[in-house]
Structure formats: C-alpha cells, structure tokens
Design a protein with these regions (language model features):
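Polyanion/phosphate-binding surface patch
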Residues: 1
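Short, glycine/charged-enriched hinge/interface segments at domain edges or termini
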Residues: 4-140
Length: 140
C-alpha cells in the first residue's frame, strides 16, 4: 500500500476539523529497509513492498492524506484528517505464504512471476539445473 507509515499514537486526535501535520522523515521505495526509527510527529513516505520502519504501526494511504508543498526535501510534511488503527494497511511478513510452503517445486521452469515471488521472500540465490539435451542414434 503506497502511503505514509505512521505512529497510531500521533493520530489519536486526528479529524476533519483537527487535522494532524507530520514531518516526512524518510522515503522508502519498494524493497528498501529503513535505517531510521520513526519518532513522534514523524511519518515515512512508503511504497508497496517496502518494509515498515521501526516505530511505525500503520499506513495511511496517499488518497487519505494531503502532501504539503515544500522547498527543501528535509521539510516535507503531510496532513492527516482521521485517526488510524493499529496495523491499518500493514501486511505482516509471510502473511501470504505459510511457513514451510513449497513455492517453486524442483524441476519447474521458473517464470518471471516465480522470480518475483522468490525475491519477495528474500531468496537471493536459487540452485538451478540445465535441461538435458538428448539425442538418439539408431544404428540398426
């Protein structure tokens, strides 16, 4: 879910009439792990597939927030007009595949889908075998 990773505690009083403004402390593209611990009053702009930064416990979709114009990238802010609940729009690691499940059986020809799935599971290397070439010569 593309949006802002937030601390639910910062948004307890957020409403249409009492919006909360948060400083955007970092931007997290897909596949990137955060090195910053989200502090009170901060949010992180996060893309689908990125790991939730430490300190964040929910995501507010971009469609439910307002990005304020800024001149300096260190001064980016967002306005949120509703309270958020714990784990809103957050999918836990491994939630889509059970531990120990076979995701690519031996002998299967790997597709782009398989490689994306393996990458999303943190599999960086896969042992593969070459399809054998066989020729039959009939001699009589």
């Amino acid at each position: 879910m593309d949006g802002y990773a937030v601390r639910v505690a910062d948004l307890l009083s957020a409403s249409q009439t009492q919006p909360v403004t948060l400083r955007v402390a970092q931007v997290l593209p897909a596949g990137v792990a955060s090195t910053h611990v989200l502090q009170p009053g901060e949010a992180a702009r996060i893309m689908t597939g990125a790991m939730l930064p430490e300190g964040a416990d929910a995501i507010v979709p971009f469609e439910e927030a307002e990005r304020l114009p800024y001149e300096d990238q260190h001064d980016e802010r967002c306005i949120i007009r509703r309270a958020s609940r714990l784990s809103d729009h957050v999918r836990a690691a491994g939630a889509d595949i059970a531990a120990g499940a076979v995701v690519a059986a031996k002998g299967r020809e790997l597709t782009a889908y398989d490689l994306a799935l393996l990458a999303s599971l943190g599999v960086a290397h896969v042992n593969v075998g070459r399809v054998p070439r066989v020729a039959v010569f009939s001699t009589g």
